[in-house]
Design a protein with these regions (language model features):
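Periplasm-facing N-terminal accessory domains of Gram-negative outer-membrane beta-barrel systems
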Residues: 1-8
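Short loop/turn motifs at secondary-structure junctions and domain boundaries
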Residues: 21, 75-78
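N-terminal periplasmic "start-of-domain" segments of outer-membrane beta-barrel proteins
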Residues: 9-38, 44, 96-101, 151
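Surface-exposed loop and edge beta-strand positions of immunoglobulin-like domains
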Residues: 33-36, 77, 110
């Protein structure tokens, strides 16, 4: 029963009880009205429009996205995909099977149903003291609709100017109550986007390459699209 001097123990973790006004944190909240006005068809398109997010890999084609084709992620302040913590309803998510071009792992936000999204909360400062090292750049919390009852169908159509590329999307959201404290929500979506050739835009035509490994549209430093005369056997 003798008194003993113990070393100080510091405990760090989530769900720490305390007043919400203990410290000011810069949190941006994107509500449903803001999300709808953006006209984004997916979570990837929505996060690409965020000024605080840079360096994301959300391109749908394999030429620019590599192994991350069809996925999307969040990169706050360009500090790296592993430095942004992604939550859904305040819960951590599993890491995607795909790996980014720089070898980073990430949470695939493309698995989050756009139709069921209620709001997005973005903590733009580091929160390592609360969440750990994966929140160095900040935290993005996707909040889903949890009290929806009924059926909601959304149909969209977009067309690129001066091109035949079109994008069609259909999303369905259904919800019903089970008892007094439980809601079940089902969401499904379909997205089809036609391809657009790089030759349809002047700023990408210069980079158009043939299957032989170099561009036939810009040989000899000529303007893109102008014909050239190939002499000799130096070009194959």
């Amino acid at each position: 029963d003798d008194n003993k001097n113990l070393e100080e123990v510091v405990i760090t973790g989530s769900y720490i009880k305390g007043a919400g006004t203990d410290e000011a944190t810069p949190v941006d909240v994107l509500d449903s009205d803001y999300i709808q006005k953006q006209g984004a068809l997916s979570i990837g398109e929505l996060t690409q429009k965020l000024a605080v997010s840079s360096g994301t890999e959300n391109n749908p084609d394999s030429f620019t996205a590599g192994g991350t084709q069809g996925t999307s992620n969040v990169n706050l302040r360009g500090l790296g995909l592993t430095s942004t913590l992604v939550l859904v309803n305040g819960k951590r998510q599993t890491i995607a099977g795909a790996v980014a071009n720089d070898g980073s792992v990430f949470v695939d936000t493309a698995t989050i149903p756009m139709a069921a999204l209620e709001r997005v909360e973005i903590l733009k400062e580091g929160a390592t003291a609360t969440y750990g090292s994966d929140a160095v750049a900040g935290v993005v919390n996707f909040i889903l609709r949890d009290d929806f009852e009924g059926l909601e169908v959304s149909v969209g159509h977009q067309k690129v100017e001066s091109s035949d590329q079109t994008t069609d999307d259909v999303s369905v959201l259904a919800g019903f109550a089970v008892g007094d404290n439980t809601n079940v929500i089902l969401s499904a979506s379909f997205l089809q986007q036609d391809p657009m050739s790089s030759a349809e835009r002047s700023y990408t035509t210069i980079n158009a390459a043939s299957t032989l490994g170099r561009s036939f549209l810009n040989l000899g430093g000529l303007a893109p699209g102008l014909p050239v005369v190939i002499r000799g056997t130096g070009i194959y």
